[in-house]
Swiss-Prot record:
InterPro entries: CDK, Kinase-like_dom_sf, Prot_kinase_dom, Protein_kinase_ATP_BS, Ser/Thr_kinase_AS. Serine/threonine-protein kinase activity is promoted by associated cyclins CCDN3 and CCNY and repressed by CDKN1A. The lineage of its organism: Eukaryota, Metazoa, Chordata, Craniata, Vertebrata. This is Cyclin-dependent kinase 14. Residues 49-64, 410-423 have a biased composition (Polar residues). It comes from the Eukaryota.
Length: 423
């Protein structure tokens, strides 16, 4: 059985040893006079997607990623910390450390609330890591119940500190604590929240690009929050091309594995499908153990080896060589992950997310309207962006148990177990 590593705190993917040296991700640190916190002056033309289509993102042929962080202060309120002051917070304990940042549990000295302090180390000759600039500039404008809240930005000579709301665990740790698959009601609520957050950022032309259980925070009330936007990309931020080494291997879509750099919001939707299956089945959907070739073989074993009929354009992708891959026929997903058959409409939704051809993947907005969610309270679709789903009566997490999926059975519905709650 494959195991997860829930300890990673990096915004940048730690390259696998099997990835060639020339393909590994490098952290770019640059300086210029550009202010990433200023609202872009150019207007982004709204993209109208047809049917369930994802939104395509075009890259710039001339733009360069070279901003420099300036100290930024936001208006404070009587219950908020004084923004921009390092002495407003107390470090309590280290939560994790990555290649360029250390994350601490902290506390506001002004209001006593717990926070997460992401302390990014700066080197004068190298400037500020662009991943940190990207994360701060994007999160500053995102206000949604299912996206981690950025409270404050503190810039000193030695460090850049991003102050986030404190959320006590993540989905990776949650699944490790409850092995064997999560309670199906909880899977549904987690997935609904994930899609809410993604729909919000996708409508604002932002890709997350690093969806994995470690980057989905879970509060003690069951709120799921998208976090770690270090690899996120906004259409208004110019770049030459997107790196094809941006998503942890297990959650990386086949088009990216095959070298495509023509990204759309469909990139994130593959990760949603992988996480959905993992929550239900209790194991990663495609736990590659060797390299990109092995990862693709695991995908094709279930979904079938693609060709021009099933995936138009696949032969033009840089790394697609038909002779490299075993010829597999596609299967019903329940043959690979039997617990999908225990929950009404789960297999159908998973099959529409896990499409090799990115153009065939369901968008986040369309997925929210899938029949899988039909037994949820209608008020969930009427919530404002900042409203938690748990403000709706009778919406709450259920107790987890190792055998929850077996006890649940095939014929139970979401509403039958709402009355029994651990909260």
């Amino acid at each position: 059985m494959s195991t997860r590593n829930c300890q990673g705190m990096d915004s940048v993917i730690k390259p696998l040893d099997t990835i060639p040296e020339d393909k590994k991700v490098r952290v770019q640190r640059t300086q210029s006079t550009f202010d990433p916190f200023e609202k872009p002056t150019n207007q982004v033309k709204r993209v109208h997607s047809e049917n369930n289509a994802c939104i395509n993102f075009k890259t710039s042929s001339t733009g360069k990623e070279s901003p420099k962080v300036r100290r930024h202060s936001s208006p404070s309120s009587p219950t908020s910390p004084k923004f921009g002051k390092a002495d407003s917070y107390e470090k309590l304990e280290k939560l994790g450390e990555g290649s360029y940042a250390t994350v601490y549990k902290g506390k506001s000295k002004v209001n006593g609330k717990l926070v997460a302090l992401k302390v990014i180390r700066l080197q004068e000759e190298e400037g500020t890591p662009f991943t940190a600039i990207r994360e701060a500039s994007l999160l500053k404008g995102l206000k949604h119940a299912n996206i981690v809240l950025l409270h404050d930005i503190i810039h000193t000579k030695e460090t850049l500190t991003l102050v986030f709301e404190y959320v006590h665990t993540d989905l990776c740790q949650y699944m490790d604590k409850h092995p064997g698959g999560l309670h199906p009601d909880n899977v549904k609520l987690f997935l609904f929240q994930l899609l809410r957050g993604l729909s919000y950022i996708h409508q604002r032309y932002i890709l997350h690009r690093d969806l994995k259980p470690q980057n989905l925070l879970i509060s003690d009330t069951g709120e799921l929050k998208l976090a770690d936007f270090g690899l996120a990309r906004a259409k208004s931020v110019p770049s030459h091309t997107y790196s094809n080494e941006v998503v942890t291997l297990w959650y990386r879509p086949p088009d990216v594995l095959l070298g495509s750099t023509e990204y759309s919001t469909c990139l994130d939707m593959w990760g949603v499908g992988c996480i959905f299956v993992e929550m239900i089945q209790g194991v990663a959907a495609f736990p590659g153990m060797k390299d990109i070739q092995d990862q693709l073989e695991r995908i094709f074993l279930v979904l079938g080896t693609p060709n021009e009929d099933t995936w138009p354009g696949v032969h033009s992708l840089p790394h697609f060589k038909p002779e490299r891959f075993t010829l597999y026929s596609s299967k019903n997903l329940r043959q690979a992950w039997n617990k999908l058959s225990y929950v009404n409409h789960a297999e159908d939704l998973a099959s529409k997310l896990l499409q090799c051809s990115p153009k065939n993947r369901l968008s986040a907005q369309a997925a929210l309207s899938h029949e899988y969610f039909s037994d949820l309270p209608p008020r969930l679709w009427e919530l404002t962006d900042m409203s938690s789903i748990f403000t709706v009566p009778n919406v709450r997490l259920q107790p987890e148990a190792g055998e929850s999926m077996r006890a649940f059975g095939k014929n139970n519905s979401y509403g039958k177990s709402l009355s029994n709650s651990k909260h």
